[in-house]
Amino acid sequence: MALWMRLLPLLALLALWGPDPAAAFVNQHLCGSHLVEALYLVCGERGFFYTPKTRREAEDLQASALSLSSSTSTWPEGLDATARAPPALVVTANIGQAGGSSSRQFRQRALGTSDSPVLFIHCPGAAGTAQGLEYRGRRVTTELVWEEVDSSPQPQGSESLPAQPPAQPAPQPEPQQAREPSPEVSCCGLWPRRPQRSQN
């Protein structure tokens, strides 16, 4: 009982102490286009990740996106509206020092419909020969296949053997079928589990 009474003032201070305004702003806008507008896309050594912006930077981007979307569109008239990029797809990468000025920031903006943005997350492979790409929660893997060319000289002369066709490499299965989905993707429910087929 005495321990609880000692911790009561500390709990009261924690309850009164508000969260960081940038974190609170990001927590309020965790769905749809606001998610992209309130975050920086940063390239790290293990792939791309998002960090929250301050409230002022996010509001400036929203105001500029609204003024740009009200101007005339540069898209061709024949292009379908669903094929356009969403207006709120604002990808911001901080390529300067941490805490640098806004002149060191590279901003790329695409205008279009108000659909929710499609986010690509790039995770390079461990050996550098495979690249992982996540598209709406589905993992796409592309691998580099090296083919060895037989450059040994053919024996010439009276003992020449009949010409043999060069050895063809065995066809490799598709990387999608050969790999199991990674456990960190399947545990979140993003990757649909395939039923195991019974071999009879």
Swiss-Prot record:
Entries under Gene3D superfamilies matching the protein: Insulin-like (1.10.100.10)
Annotated Pfam families: Insulin (PF00049)
Pro residues bias: start-end ranges: 163-174
Tissues expressing this chain: Expressed in pancreas, eye and, to a lower extent, in limb.
One GO term describing the cellular component: extracellular space
GO MF annotations in UniProt: hormone activity
Annotated spans, Disordered: 148-200
UniProt-listed InterPro entries: Insulin, Insulin-like, Insulin-like_sf
Sequence ranges of Low complexity compositional bias: 175-184
PANTHER family in UniProt: INSULIN, ISOFORM 2 (PTHR11454:SF32), INSULIN/INSULIN GROWTH FACTOR (PTHR11454)
Protein name listed in UniProt: Insulin, isoform 2
Lineage summary: Eukaryota, Metazoa, Chordata, Craniata, Vertebrata
Gene (UniProt): INS-IGF2
